[in-house]
Structure formats: structure tokens, C-alpha cells
Amino acid sequence: MLLSVPLLLGLLGLAVAEPAVYFKEQFLDGDGWTSRWIESKHKSDFGKFVLSSGKFYGDEEKDKGLQTSQDARFYALSASFEPFSNKGQTLVVQFTVKHEQNIDCGGGYVKLFPNSLDQTDMHGDSEYNIMFGPDICGPGTKKVHVIFNYKGKNVLINKDIRCKDDEFTHLYTLIVRPDNTYEVKIDNSQVESGSLEDDWDFLPPKKIKDPDASKPEDWDERAKIDDPTDSKPEDWDKPEHIPDPDAKKPEDWDEEMDGEWEPPVIQNPEYKGEWKPRQIDNPDYKGTWIHPEIDNPEYSPDPSIYAYDNFGVLGLDLWQVKSGTIFDNFLITNDEAYAEEFGNETWGVTKAAEKQMKDKQDEEQRLKEEEEDKKRKEEEEAEDKEDDEDKDEDEEDEEDKEEDEEEDVPGQAKDEL
């Protein structure tokens, strides 16, 4: 069958546009994940991950992911995939994070390693290619890390990207393009973008201050100067404080005993403060001197900053004070549109139901606490009432006792007579 040229080109276009999915993990096969993910044995006390959808969710099965389960632990777990290079193509790294424990300090990021990583020995100092995701510790650290390993050095972004710090599931996406640009998205909305060269210190600066240049000695940066024709008035200088003219020495003042009497001082109404000449525009003002710059001889552009020869492992290498974070919906691809669609079909489908379930739980908890508080108050009121009744009975008994004693006194006197 012969195909027309337009149809053939269209089919070829579809084939070219087919996204490459290098890694995808949704944990939809129960315990099957345990055969794909490898625990590091570098330390014997690494925390354990469990499969869970958490205390609240949008879909109990779809929302199952890897959950940290032990407080104050380091975690080290990784999964491998067919090695690939992102040279000449876009790289998209995406996953969801849910800090349902209202995290106080802990990581929620992932690391991408080359396939040379020994997964059984993965640890905090294992060299990685990219680290990406949220990190929270106290009120001061609530950021999205985007760290690239460039020529053996981990280089941090120069911008502060704020992460989500609530208890719900959020979608984090990093896009790195072959034109050395990047984009960070949270919940499929852009929160940062720009140039790799501009926003990371991968390379020496393009320009440096000219080492041979210096500010001329006669360069005047003063915008205003004292008016040379202005002079201080002759009657300007007055003391700030003067003796109180209305003060009188007390009649009983004894100078031999009390010393020489001195009147108290008061603020001088004629005091004018420090005299300063008026200011005028400086006729020699040249503005702030700016150090001229020259091309940095150490600078050399690198069009391949974005590129890595080998990706082969995705790892969760982190520390958490309070456990409970759930990681899910991992995706590594070369297609931005596919990643966005995948995010909408996973996180996007269940986010509303997740919030509804959480809101319902919160309302039930609120009503429970109200009922418990009401019951506690009723019990306290009942105890107070019982105490009051006991007190009244004690007072009545005391009054009866006193009356009996009063009646006994006359009878005793009669018997004595």
C-alpha cells in the first residue's frame, strides 16, 4: 500500500514525538516494589520504608507510596533503570511528596545517580548527578533544592525556591533543557525558571573588575558640600543647660554641713544646638565611581552544562526527625507535555478527594474534642456540686453539734446545784 507524502511525514512525526520514559513508579503491584528498590547496607540503622497511602488519601490504592516509618533516622533506598544520557534532549524529573506528619525537619528530595552507584552502599556522600526536591527544617528552611554535580562539585542554585509545607500531596517537577535553561514546577505550575549559567555558579564570571583601573584621586563622590560662604552667627553658641533663675537656696541650708549650694540646672531656651553650615550642590560632583570591567580571561562558555553521560539510579537519601512522608508517582522522561499529563492523571485526579477526606477527619476530630471537653466540664461541675453538697452537710452537722452543746450547758448547771 502506498502512502501519501503528507501522511508518511505525519506518521514519522508521531514516531519522533513518542516520549521516552526512562523510569516510572506508581507502586500499583502491592509488595512488588520490594524487588525493584534496594536498601543500602552502608549503615545498620537506616530507617525503613513501608508501602502506605497514609492516614488520608484521595484513592487508597493509587495514593500508595513509600512512607518513612521511623523517627530520627537516615533513609537510603534506591531503584535502578536502563542507563541513558540526556545529551541533546530534555530531562524531566517528577514525583509527589506528602508530609502528612506536619514535618518539622526532614528531606523530601530525590537524587539521580549514574548507574555506577553501588546501591547496597549508597549513603550521604555518594556522588550524584542531580538532587531535586523539598527540604524543611524549622521556620528558616522551607526550600526546593536544585543541585547539579558539575565537574565533581555540587553546585547549589542561587535563588530561593519556597516549597509547600502543608500536610497534602504535592507534585514537584524539574525540567532541564539542552539549551541550558531550566524550569521548576510545583503542582504543575511554574515557580521558577531561567538559565543554568545565570542561576548557578558553574563557570567563572564573564566579566571581572579591571585590575589596572583605580579611582582617580580627584574623583569627587560628594553630592552636597558645605557652603563656603556660610558662617556661624555670633550669638549662636549658648550653653545647653543653665542654672534655674527661679531656684532659691532653702532656708535651712547649712553650707558647713551641706556644702556650697548650687541651683539646679534647666534646659536653656536659647540653646540652638550644634551649628552646621548649609549644604549646596557640589560643583565638582562626578557621581559614584564605578570600577570598569573587562572580559574575564578565565571564562569559557560551556554549552553542555545541562548534559550528563549517564543516569541509572534514582535514590531516596535523606534524614527525617519526624517520619511519615510518602513518595509516589516517580517519573523520568524527556517529554514535558507527557510529564504534565502524567501529573494530572495521578496527583491531579486524587488531590481534591484527599483534601475532602482530611477535612472530614479534621471535623470529626473537632467534634470529638468538643464532646470530650463538654464531658470533662460536666464531670467537673458534678464534682464541684458534690463538693458543695458535702460542704453544706458538714456545716449543718457543725451547727447541730453547736446547738446540742448549748442545750447541755443549763442542764449541767442544774445538776451541780
Swiss-Prot record:
Entry's localization field: Endoplasmic reticulum lumen; Cytoplasm, Cytosol; Secreted, Extracellular space, Extracellular matrix; Cell surface
Domain of life: Eukaryota
GO BP, sorted A to Z: cardiac muscle cell differentiation; cellular response to electrical stimulus; cellular response to lithium ion; cellular response to virus; cellular senescence; cortical actin cytoskeleton organization; ERAD pathway; intracellular calcium ion homeostasis
Region feature Disordered, mapped onto this chain: 193-278, 350-417
Residues given in the record as an alpha-D-glucoside binding sites: Y109, K111, Y128, D135, D317
Binding site for Ca(2+): Q26, K62, K64, D328
Disulfide bonds: C105-C137
Modified residue annotations for N6-acetyllysine: K48, K159, K209
Keywords, comma-separated and alphabetical: Acetylation, Calcium, Chaperone, Cytoplasm, Cytoplasmic vesicle, Disulfide bond, Endoplasmic reticulum, Extracellular matrix, Glycoprotein, Hydroxylation, Lectin, Lysosome, Metal-binding, Repeat, Sarcoplasmic reticulum, Secreted, Signal, Zinc
P-domain: region residues: 198-308
Ranges for region Interaction with PPIB: 237-270
Sequence repeat residue intervals: 191-202, 210-221, 227-238, 244-255, 259-269, 273-283, 287-297
Disease listed for this protein: CALR somatic mutations are frequently found in myeloproliferative neoplasms lacking JAK2 or MPL mutations. Myeloproliferative neoplasms are chronic myeloid cancers characterized by overproduction of mature blood cells, and may evolve into acute myeloid leukemia. In addition to chronic myeloid leukemia with the BCR-ABL fusion gene, the three most common myeloproliferative neoplasms are essential thrombocythemia, polycythemia vera, and myelofibrosis.
Function: Calcium-binding chaperone that promotes folding, oligomeric assembly and quality control in the endoplasmic reticulum (ER) via the calreticulin/calnexin cycle. This lectin interacts transiently with almost all of the monoglucosylated glycoproteins that are synthesized in the ER. Interacts with the DNA-binding domain of NR3C1 and mediates its nuclear export. Involved in maternal gene expression regulation. May participate in oocyte maturation via the regulation of calcium homeostasis.
Oligomer and partners: Monomer. Component of an EIF2 complex at least composed of CELF1/CUGBP1, CALR, CALR3, EIF2S1, EIF2S2, HSP90B1 and HSPA5. Interacts with PDIA3/ERp57 and SPACA9. Interacts with TRIM21. Interacts with NR3C1. Interacts with PPIB. Interacts (via P-domain) with PDIA5. Interacts with GABARAP. Interacts with HLA-E-B2M and HLA-G-B2M complexes. Interacts with HLA-F. Interacts with CLCC1.
Domain commentary: Can be divided into a N-terminal globular domain, a proline-rich P-domain forming an elongated arm-like structure and a C-terminal acidic domain. The P-domain binds one molecule of calcium with high affinity, whereas the acidic C-domain binds multiple calcium ions with low affinity.
Protein name: Calreticulin
Gene transcribed to yield this protein: CALR
